[in-house]
Amino acid sequence: MKKILMILALLALAVGQSLADDASAKDSDSKGKTITVQGILVDTSCYFEEGQKGDDHDGMKACGKDCLNSGVPAGVLVDDKVYILIFPAKAFADVAGQTVEIKGDAYGDNLINPKKAFVIDKNGKKPIKLTGFEMM
């Protein structure tokens, strides 16, 4: 539990620093540029701590889903880079470990505020509902 809290604190610091860097940049576009990424949806705690990419890991069924439902930030793993989603993680809990496509505003090097999200499977793209989630 202490490790998870430490990781969350470090992520919060990284988000704050990145947003501060963006705010002080000379670029007048305060929203950031729009990007689209496609990769594996991970819970950042288990990924950064142990490299876990799926929903079921370390002998725990639905660990990724549980972590995201508890507020651990969601990320999209693209090659060796993780884009952290600036959005309530609960919106992505049901697709932990699956391939997703996220389109949104980029901040810094690895933060995305999603505007559209899709889960991708053998049948194509299905939208992920991004409404009805409150930021704390």
Positions of PLM-derived features:
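N-terminal export/membrane-targeting signals
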Residues: M1-D21
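OB-fold and OB-like single-stranded nucleic-acid-recognition modules
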Residues: L19-M136
